[in-house]
């Protein structure tokens, strides 16, 4: 697995096997840094500075992100196809050998998924972005893979979707939970999981949620089914499908609806709003009354803030058509 430059290297043995702490792993996430705007913490920004829009060019793409110091979420990593980039100290660096990197809320930790097996196991790199240290944690054994990492809101755990190859496609068979403090991973098989399921955290970090045959299912961390909401459409929304308050969650509306995006009540699954927006992707929530969506704009695309009627209120990023075709993905997290 590629290294992250500058980390101390230590090795320790646990009950679950050997966890290798590699200073070089966390430093690979900081190598080849390209200049970009440095972000000031919103809490310390003067009122005038907080309103200034800063344009940030994303390394290796034609994407321009438009940020303000007081924004509630910011782009902390992104991928272009299977190439991942991480933001450190306001700069983005290409991370060779990793297909995705996701930063935890508050920015202390990141989890990176490599592009290849190591010793017949899939794994993740847990990076402590404050201490500049990293630890390799095995997730599943070949032929399974674990990808699509999502952090719990407290930054204590990451969940990944576990898949098995079936012909030319990959079928979901369960999920893996990575404990950031213990530096361990536990894989859980989910009986009857939807083949296209992608597991995300519920807002409390005690259950995971995924789509199931056009609806939504919630599972305990033991893989047991807790509840099902039929006919909601599949959960969607970048790193977190749930609103900041945890009251609502986003789904792609069923095909029988005119509107593409639905807002559902977390407790009941009932419809809270239909959002009439031509979303090509949903990147999460801005606040409880606004979401982030990628929409067509001329011959290109834009990431926008939109209210729950579908009205765009701000442009967050300009995305060329070539980058969208190359599957660029912007990861917005809460600092």
Model-derived segments and spans:
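Secretory targeting and sorting signals
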Residues: 1-48
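Sequence signature of WD/YWTD-type beta-propeller architectures
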Residues: 2-7, 45-335
């Amino acid at each position: 697995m590629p290294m992250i430059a500058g980390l101390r290297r230590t090795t320790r043995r646990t009950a679950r096997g050997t966890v290798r702490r590699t200073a070089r792993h966390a430093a690979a996430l900081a190598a080849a840094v390209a200049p970009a705007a440095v972000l000031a913490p919103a809490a310390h920004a003067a009122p005038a500075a907080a309103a200034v829009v800063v344009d940030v060019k994303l390394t290796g793409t034609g994407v321009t992100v438009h940020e303000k110091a007081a924004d509630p979420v910011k782009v902390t990593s992104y991928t272009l196809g299977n190439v991942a980039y991480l933001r450190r100290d306001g700069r983005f660096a290409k991370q060779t050998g990793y297909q995705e990197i996701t930063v935890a809320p508050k920015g202390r930790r990141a989890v990176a998924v490599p592009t290849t097996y190591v010793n017949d196991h899939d794994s993740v790199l847990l990076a402590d972005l404050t201490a500049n240290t990293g630890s390799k944690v095995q997730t599943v054994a070949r032929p399974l893979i674990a990808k699509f990492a999502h952090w719990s809101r407290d930054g204590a755990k990451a969940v990944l979707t576990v898949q098995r190859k079936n012909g030319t496609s990959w079928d979901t068979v369960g999920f893996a939970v990575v404990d950031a403090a213990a530096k361990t991973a536990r894989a859980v098989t989910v009986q009857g999981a939807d083949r296209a399921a992608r597991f995300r955290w519920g807002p409390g970090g005690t259950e995971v949620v995924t789509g199931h045959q056009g609806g939504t299912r919630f599972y305990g961390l033991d893989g047991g089914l807790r509840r099902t909401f039929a006919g909601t459409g599949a959960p969607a929304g970048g790193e977190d499908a749930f609103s900041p308050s945890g009251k609502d969650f986003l789904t792609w509306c069923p095909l029988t609806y005119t509107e593409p995006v639905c807002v559902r009540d977390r407790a009941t699954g009932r419809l809270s709003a239909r959002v009439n927006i031509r979303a090509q992707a949903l990147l999460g929530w801005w606040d409880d009354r606004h979401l982030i969506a990628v929409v067509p704009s001329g011959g290109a695309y834009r990431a926008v803030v939109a209210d729950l009627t579908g009205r765009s209120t701000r442009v967050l990023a300009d995305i060329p058509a070539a980058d969208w075709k190359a599957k660029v993905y912007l990861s917005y997290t809460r600092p």
